[in-house]
Amino acid sequence: MALEIDAKNAAAAATGDGGAPGKAKAKENKSNSNSNNNNVPAAGEKNLVNGSSAATKKKGKKNRNKSPPQQDVSAAGAALSNGHAEKASVNGDAADANANVLDKKVEEEGATAAAGATEAAAEVGSSGDGGAATEGEAAASGEDVDLDALHDVGITVNISSPGADVLSVQLSSMELVQEIHQLLMDREETCHRTCFSLQLDNVTLDNFAELKTIEGLEQGSTIRVVEEPYTMREARIHVRHVRDLLKNLDPADAYNGIDCTSLTYLITITQGDLLDKKRTRPDSVDCTPPDYVIPGVREPPLLPLHPNIKNAKGPQALKVLTTSAWNPPPGPRKLHGDLMYLYVVTMEDKRFHISACSKGFYINQSTDECFNPKPDNPSHLSHSLIDLLSHISPSFRRAFQTIQKRRTMRHAFERVATPYQVYQWSAPQLEHTVDAIRAEDAFSSKLGYEEHIPGQTRDWNEELQTTRELPRKTLPERLLRERAIFKVHGDFVTAATRGAMAVIDGNVLAINPGEDPKMQMFIWNNIFFSLGFDVRDHYKELGGDHAAFVAPRYDLHGVRVYNAVDIEGLYTLGTVVIDYRGYRVTAQSIIPGILEREQEQSVVYGSIDFGKTVLSHPKYLELLRLAGKHLKILPHSVLNERDEPVELCSSVECKGIIGNDGRHYILDLLRTFPPDVNFLKLQDVQLSKELTDMGFPIEHRHKLCCLRQELLEAFIEDRYVTFIRIAAVHLQQLNAKKQAEKELPSITEKQEEPEKEQAEKSSAEQPEKEKEKEKDKEDEQKESKPSPTETKSAEAMVNAIREAQSNVAVSNEVQAAEVVKRACAAVGSLKEKEFDFRFNPDVFSPGIRHVDSPESGAQSLAKQKRLVQDAAEFLVLKQIPAFIKEHMAHSSPPIDGQSLTESLHSHGINVRYLGKVIKMLSQMPRMDYLHRIAILELIVRATKHIYYTYMQSTEPLHLSAAISHFLNCLLTTGPVNPAVSSEEVHKKQSRNNGGKHNKHNKSNKSGKPQSTSAAAATQNGHSSTAANGSANSAANTASTSGNSNYDWTLVTPRSLWQQIRKEIKSYWNWELDCDSIESACAKYGLLRISLLRAFCLKVGIQVLLREYNFESKHKPTFGDDDIVNVFPVVKHISPRATDAYNFYTTGQAKIQQGLLKEGYELISEALNLLNNVFGAMHQENGSCLRMLARLSYLLGDAQDALAIQQRAVIMSERVNGIDHPSTILEYTHLSLYSFANGHVGMSLKLLYRARYLLVLVCGEDHPEVALIDSNISLILHALGEYELSLRFIEHALKLNLKYFGNKAMHVAVSYHLMARIQSCMGDFRSALNNEKETYSIYKSQLGEKHDKTRESAECLRLLTHEAVALQRKMNDIYSNGKLTSDLPPIHITPPSMGSVLEMLNTINGILFVHISQKDIVKVRSQIEKHLKTSDESGPNDDNEVTAALKTFVAAINYNDTEQPKEGSEVEGATATQLTNGSEDSTTTVSS
């Protein structure tokens, strides 16, 4: 195995062709092994049917019988990764099948994690049985799927291992031999073997050969596992693998943020796999909710966030397993075959020294004091260390068997590594044990990979650029390319994060060590690192440190959009921005040759001094002009230092450098998009009265404010719709005028008649023209929805206008051109006769001298400026109101600051407008929850600015004390006593008072903006933050060298909240009307635990998992020991799977058309492609799983929905976080499907978990809480827990009344549920009153004849009857003065589970409309009769209706051929999914 891994790394280092240790390929290749092997599941695992349940397989059979080509595309998923692996092996990526082993650790770990990835990929890889798009659909969406090339053949082989039963495995013929290695290392019987070869007929198989290429391999062949001699390297791999097996259940790595491990608690909460559960009877369910879940909790506790942590670790097999101090073997022992020595302490407290030799492992006679390498007597040599330890320790043998059983019982998704590290903001106190391998990783392995790649470290730039150069013409090529890009990018992010932490921790030597620490730059592992400071006054005119701090983020945005455009021949740098310990670090790949020359010699395009000197280059103009068409960037000319015009197709700061490899690189993309004039005070710009009345322009602390790409797209779309409308109006007028002129000579008698005819003609033509307008509008919207690379070009827009002109029969081209000219002038087009909306990013840049070219038209520069101003005005006057209006329906309400920020960004609204958003929200009571979330986010962001400042002024010795003190000042009003003696503070301050401020001012004031050529190429905005003027002095004293002070000890709760108020006012222009945490909580309804969570995630703090008393008046809430860790906050660009995205969007379109089954198949294929690109574990995979689960449920397969949604929950917990908003949403969906499958108790537990997480994140006052409470109440009602049920529904009703109003359908349902519960409790009077409210709402909203209104009326009648009967009996009692013996008991009939499920579906936005077969036949006959009549009568004006009817008939006919299976929820039915606020909440109709 050593040779294979070394071969892989050598090839990767040599070529860079996707050869990086990666995440995906081991998962993908191995997934096909298991997905094709339904008869032989991995050890201890249940049989996974192609990533779905057996129900999915049945459904897949139907689809395959109907459409054979789909099966071939499904096979593509299995075949692709193996075919690519072979192709990659030629290109130097030979061992990608083993990439997962090397990716998450060094390869000595063995393949345990990769084998876990195998099963996970098998689970998700072909969910829905690979239902693919047909060839026609693929072609329609631009796919060029070569089904023949993706054809695959299965083969069954027997594997014979020493000491184990013969194993029969079904594999793909395109699998690599290496896949069998992975499979064996994951199985319980063979997992302890790492050093072995596979032989067929005594011939050793090449690990990187495909099975179909092996001579003599046929169905039923037996492959033997042969133990191989150890080398030093193989022995280390084996020891590391044993260590990983022993700590497999230990969550310590997930809490510590190591090796891309992360947490999931679903299986803990459900106490096992939901698919293995049996249906529960309602009377056997324990439904008592925890106290912290019942409505009315003031502050949710923290401990339930991590349930059952005491039992998570598993049994301990050994006390110590470490390398011996007798290492390395002396010369004489090397000649006897000794490789290394180990030291073991067993649970029986026996100590052993173990020798590793080429034959295996044995006990030697050494002690701690005496070296005696001879074998112990009696000697016992084992090829596996596990066998030896089992022989000498019975406790080890028992514990190891238990660990293995629990390991193999875990869900496959719990074992596979995530693509990026997910950090936990709270963690328990972890036991720190002896671990030599952990110590070796921390100190011996400096770069992580250099001892594994012969001759050199990884050339990140070469790998990143080579993967982008891979061919992309066919689907297999694109999948290979995207997988390679994703693998290398993931490794680069991991390495950059590790390097940035090492830089801040002081473990990397600077390339300019003699300069001020703020000015130092670093190169580590072929990555360039720069700190976030304005070191050379580079940003002096733009805001200094403030500008330098945000510049890397804007640069990252620029890299993202240029990567998305993906112009062949145009290259960007690998870029990652890391915030760690208060510092911002930018990590970038290095352009070849940049370190060998000066900056002036390197840059051939752009400017290095903000426009004083400007260069251009024909090749860059060609490439950037192509990119600019998609990004709406206007080519423009500026004057250089010699007053010569220079053409640019980007901002002037964008630099072009041709590397020694001949590639054309662009960097410094911080001004890719135009500036935001609302936050710039410019002399020659006058904003509109509406904006000035709102307080704009606001002078921001830096001048790099840019508009977002999403805003520009929305703005252009809005202007295009206006342009079409104006053009249509003018064309109508011309046409009407022309018609009137025609008719005028023939009319001589009546003067009124021409007017009448003209009016009639205009009105007759109006619908047709309106259709044209709507059609153009829909086309534009359709074009504007995809990525920026698919935005409609200006030429296409003009063609659409010309087509509209011809459709309305305007023959006079001169007049038509005049119409277009007027419309262009009205909307502000840059060209007089074309719709042209592009933006000049330099139009307001200071110091730039523009050339107002005559060919662009008169006043072109003024038009460009006006366009940028209009876009900024559009943001404030249209986009912000549209954002608020969209959330008024509460269809997908943000839950925390992160989801709020994402929603703002999707509308093109920058976070700096959050103050303005809050002002508008404050006037809307129904948006109270969003107002509160926005204020919380504002406080957290302002506090982050201040926190960074103080962290920079804190020396490492006092980090935990400083952080805990800061949290005390932020979240409490009790005593805050810094854990530093006052004597030490005064001593340090008096020592530092003299010269610390002067040192910062020793910056080199030379003309060059950078100190080295590396910096010239890469550093362009990496600076520290400063919270406000009063805080800046602390930042100026900070350095990474330890020249720190104790300013943080002077912070008090009062001073901190004063700084927060100032920061919010200066940055967001909003007044925070409170000066302490208590007043903030009282005024805005904030929860301290929510603020703690949000702040820790924002800045990277991990606190101890315990209950915190925030209102303690006697001792500080946080102590030094409560700060467990500090982790990095990483920003990077996530690569995209374009083909999978196309399949997904096509599937969504099918769903919106009501074709649920076709949509299901397309999204299943999207999931297969995502699994090929990203591996088994990724956020986008989770979105596909959620959609597939919902579709399965709508199609009547609740069991399949449960299986898929369970995987979606685990995936969301692992890749997003255990308390992420998406995870909460997944839990609520899973609870519904659990109930539908009869798991009533589990459904309640899942809802309790979702409610706890939701309240922890945002508090009880939220529309989503109302939804969850309604679900809980309904299920408790079904179980007879009426009092508990009433508490939840009362809270839900209160929230629904607040957020939806008195007449909303949500409120009607809540009143109805409350009436049902109260009637069961015998409170008929209250029930009657509540049902009256329901009836009133239904009557006003739906009318008296609606079914819901009639049902409510019938319910009122029954309740009235029961209430009268009960009152009559009570009156008898009162009149007689005593109880009568014949008073009948109140008969309470609990609702059936079917009726409860129906109501649950209604609450969650799912409505099943049942249609009998007789109804379908009747409807079909009526529609066909109508169609026949319309055909006989000739052309029908109502073409759309006719087409819709034909589609409906086809759908009914389709449904007749494929009826849902028995027991399904929808039998020959139409399933309508109403809006439910989730991503997949689209109104759909499926026959």
Curated annotation (Swiss-Prot):
The gene is clu. Residues 1009-1019, 1470-1487 have a biased composition (Polar residues). It is found in: Cytoplasm. GO terms for cellular component: cytosol. The lineage of its organism: Eukaryota, Metazoa, Ecdysozoa, Arthropoda, Hexapoda. Keywords: Cytoplasm, Phosphoprotein, Repeat, TPR repeat. Residues 111-126, 1020-1040 have a biased composition (Low complexity). Residues 438-680 form the Clu domain. TPR repeats lie at residues 1140-1173, 1266-1299, 1301-1334. This is Protein clueless. Residues 56-65, 988-1005 have a biased composition (Basic residues). One of its GO terms (biological process) is ribosome localization. Belongs to the CLU family. The modification Phosphoserine is found at residue 284. Residues 739-785 have a biased composition (Basic and acidic residues). It comes from Drosophila mojavensis (Fruit fly).
